[in-house]
Amino acid sequence: MSEIGLVKIYFGKVRDLYEIDDKRMLMVASDRLSAFDVILDDPIPSKGEILTQISNFWFKKLAHIMPNHFTGQTVYDVLPENEAKALEKRAVVAKKLTPVKVEAIVRGYLAGSGWKDYQKTGSVCGIQLPEGMQEAQQLPEVIFTPSTKAAVGDHDENISFEECGRIIGKELAEEVRAKAVRLYTEAAEYAKSRGIIICDTKFEFGLDENGTLTLMDEVLTPDSSRFWPADQYKVGTNPPSFDKQFVRDWLEQSGWNKKAPAPKVPADVIQKTVEKYREALTLLTQD
């Protein structure tokens, strides 16, 4: 990825943040891929550009629900032209916000860690569910299952809503839950009309200088969500998905112990992953 003249203030699993001034920062989506909380050596070509386009699409589409991190400026307003040109498809000029210290996870279907939790306890993150549910089944209602925010290399931990309230305050927890459920519900309805089932997703929120809850980071991408092709969806199975599942499945069967460093991922697995990301972008955004 191109070098730029701004000071880097954060290096994440996928995104890097650069200082613009005390109110704004540049968020750049790389082609890095993380799986099982380990950053892989092999990038996924164009992934950062595809994720940024999907995120920007949703930020605009859902702007009537709540404010987001957009400043209304482009990279050309803050970078020299040659730097801006290299990053225009993968960078966003974002407001500096105080992050809310929980991950806002919303689930509409029973899958992943939720399915494992249900098999053991009959509930997901302390929310009791009906008996006899199957993998990938739609939940009776959308549920909010927050988790703690881990540092790079650590694992997020699922927590109860009560614990979420203790971490960020009851009133803010209520607002985060209400907004996250509404964002998911509207997005899931739209995506379904385009042939994608959004099984679950993770939102990130921040507070602006006035304490207003604001949507930030990335929204409803194949990295932050589980997207299933509607035409291949079947209850009782683990449906294929438009995301890094290809890579995760390959790593699972490779015998890797899920600690850094990760094994080298074959080129055909990387190629299939790029195609899945592109397909999701096309389905969601084409007219």
UniProtKB/Swiss-Prot annotation:
Q: In which pathway does it act?
A: Purine metabolism; IMP biosynthesis via de novo pathway; 5-amino-1-(5-phospho-D-ribosyl)imidazole-4-carboxamide from 5-amino-1-(5-phospho-D-ribosyl)imidazole-4-carboxylate: step 1/2
Lineage top rank: taxon:
Bacteria
What EC number(s) would the UniProt record show? 6.3.2.6
Q: Which reaction does it catalyse?
A: 5-amino-1-(5-phospho-D-ribosyl)imidazole-4-carboxylate + L-aspartate + ATP = (2S)-2-[5-amino-1-(5-phospho-beta-D-ribosyl)imidazole-4-carboxamido]succinate + ADP + phosphate + 2 H(+)
Any one Pfam family here would be SAICAR_synt
The alphabetical list of record keywords is: ATP-binding, Ligase, Nucleotide-binding, Purine biosynthesis
Q: Which GO terms describe its molecular function?
A: ATP binding; phosphoribosylaminoimidazolesuccinocarboxamide synthase activity
- The UniProt record lists the keyword ATP-binding: yes
SUPFAM superfamilies registered for this protein in UniProt: SAICAR synthase-like
- Keyword ATP-binding listed? The answer is yes
Entries under PROSITE patterns matching the protein: SAICAR_SYNTHETASE_1, SAICAR_SYNTHETASE_2
CDD domains found in the cross-reference section: SAICAR_synt_Sc
Which GO BP terms apply? Answer: 'de novo' IMP biosynthetic process
- Similarity comment: family membership: Belongs to the SAICAR synthetase family.
The record's annotation in NCBIfam families points to: PRK13961.1, purC
Query: What's the protein name?
Result: Phosphoribosylaminoimidazole-succinocarboxamide synthase
Source species: Neisseria meningitidis serogroup B (strain ATCC BAA-335 / MC58)
